[in-house]
Amino acid sequence: MPSRKSKAAALDTPQSESSTFSSTLDSSAPSPARNLRRSGRNILQPSSEKDRDHEKRSGEELAGRMMGKDANGHCLREGKEQEEGVKMAIEGLARMERRLQRATKRQKKQLEEDGIPVPSVVSRFPTAPYHHKSTNAEEREAKEPVLKTHSKDVEREAEIGVDDVVKMEPAATNIIEPEDAQDAAERGAARPPAVNSSYLPLPWKGRLGYACLNTYLRNAKPPIFSSRTCRMASIVDHRHPLQFEDEPEHHLKNKPDKSKEPQDELGHKFVQELGLANARDIVKMLCWNEKYGIRFLRLSSEMFPFASHPVHGYKLAPFASEVLAEAGRVAAELGHRLTTHPGQFTQLGSPRKEVVESAIRDLEYHDELLSLLKLPEQQNRDAVMIIHMGGQFGDKAATLERFKRNYARLSQSCKNRLVLENDDVGWTVHDLLPVCEELNIPMVLDYHHHNICFDPAHLREGTLDISDPKLQERIANTWKRKGIKQKMHYSEPCDGAVTPRDRRKHRPRVMTLPPCPPDMDLMIEAKDKEQAVFELMRTFKLPGFEKINDMVPYDRDDENRPAPPVKAPKKKKGGKRKRTTDEEAAEPEEVDTAADDVKDAPEGPKEVPEEERAMGGPYNRVYWPLGCEEWLKPKKREVKKGKVPEEVEDEGEFDG
């Protein structure tokens, strides 16, 4: 059997290496046929049938070696011979790669000698359209790189049999526009500076509010919030009865038994119980807000999970009527305003029928939720549903027409509550105001969204131009015509955000008030929720700021905590010995002393009544500084790792 070196030498002979492209080195030889590859390179084909057969045999031999077979197709013996075959295959592939690289260089040189223009960058898709963004014809001629294709070259390609002539057009994926050459962050930072108003709505007479979640109550034990939810799979699983139906559910010891017959009413009951727990906590949130001067709250859209789902959806009445009516009664007594904000997928202007149907179901669900609160007439009128127009779908005018048609399909109760909001992507105040005036829909102004998405033909970035009295009057009239108290939204971008994408993210807390009327209902959209409202109240000394005090880090005195365990008296150490008569007489005194030790044990914390739980305690300690959200939870115990004795470490090194 020939050795590995002899085979490698045979594969690396000049004849085998140059067999494929030997004709290219002979200038007197006729130019071989060229076929266009996908990459745009013209690779010369073998001109000799003998060379093609040799290449085929070499490839088959390499493939056989990789599969453990020899040139005749017989299986090689395992062991050293098979290992040598793998190494030979790897070496052969490396040589093939080197030959391909050399052939490419020769082919490129041949094309240059033939006078065929070679583009420096060849697109994978040479026919991709190229659209330049120049403002006039002169700039376009000066900036566009033009690679002309000579007619002689086209005729030459036709003669040699090329099917598709490569047009040397600059590819859209490889040409960098002058406008796009600048980094996105630099473009954002280089935009015209914002022009802000110096007006502050002081003294403040309006209502400040936050959205959905109270961070202080959410971290109470047990937590108080109204957005408990579940997965769709949980609803499906809970259609099966529990393993032990007479015992309460447990995530490990008593789970739904999928071997039992499913019942749809059990799945509905599971998700409805979540909704009822959410609705019950509204009362606690309203009482907490009243104590600290907050009388404006946005209810969570996730209060009743999957209520608008096409399959697992359900009506809120009658199972939630009583709980929601109780929440509405408390809100009416305290004079609080409640609103909702359906999600971003609620789009009446979508061209997709299923999206529109889902949006209508979602709006009907929110309307039923607000109606079951049974609020007084004016408060019920002020309980609005705010939505965005959504996507533009390539044509703003067509989207607006679809919105008008689908708006007409809503029930009158939904129409009475629907409000449009300008967004930070594509719909400006000037886009929405005409349709709001036409359809008698109130428009809520979001200052933060306006600073990102506005019409430069009418306004500049900032709060000054948007505060124009004529424009503000048009916005206010959309509310007055329906007798609804106007509201606005305010938030600020995070520090260091310059691109539109980064600027959309809300800062944890806002630093100032917008130039709105001093009696406005202002929704503060910030990550820190009620703490952002507290920050404004403290900064501008708004009514109620004196009630708010700082928390004690990691300690809350408004929760019931378990009493500390009573330590048993320590027994005196000593060996057994015979007692004397005097010691036996003193024995009763020792017993009394031990009993006194038990009586003097520290008392546990006083029990906090349910109505005072998580309300801030006697000193109203509910404020946590910016970035100190961990104060809301008990401090984590630090586990100190004991040192391992050196003897043990030494023994471990020699364990086998």
UniProtKB/Swiss-Prot annotation:
Gene Ontology BP, a term: mitochondrial DNA repair
Biased composition (Basic and acidic residues): 48-82, 135-146, 550-561, 596-614
Residue stretches of biased makeup (Low complexity): 13-32
One cellular component (GO) term of this entry: mitochondrion
Gene Ontology molecular function, alphabetical: endonuclease activity
E.C. numbers: 3.-.-.-
Gene3D superfamilies on file: Divalent-metal-dependent TIM barrel enzymes (3.20.20.150)
Protein keywords: DNA damage, DNA excision, DNA repair, Endonuclease, Hydrolase, Nuclease
Compositional bias annotation for Acidic residues: 583-595, 647-656
Compositional bias ranges of the Basic residues kind: 568-579
The keyword DNA damage is assigned to this record: yes
Disulphide connectivity of cysteines: none
InterPro entries, alphabetized: UvdE, Xyl_isomerase-like_sf
DNA damage found in the keyword field: yes
Region feature Disordered, mapped onto this chain: 1-82, 119-146, 175-194, 241-264, 492-515, 550-620, 636-656
Cofactor or coenzyme needed: Mg(2+)
PANTHER family reported for this sequence: UV-DAMAGE ENDONUCLEASE (PTHR31290:SF5)
General function of this protein: Endonuclease for the repair of UV-irradiated DNA. Involved in the excision of cyclobutane pyrimidine dimers (CPD) and 6-4 pyrimidine pyrimidones (6-4PP) which forms the UV damage repair (UVDR) pathway.
Family indicated by similarity: Belongs to the uve1/UvsE family.
Protein name: UV-damage endonuclease
Organism of derivation: Neurospora crassa (strain ATCC 24698 / 74-OR23-1A / CBS 708.71 / DSM 1257 / FGSC 987)
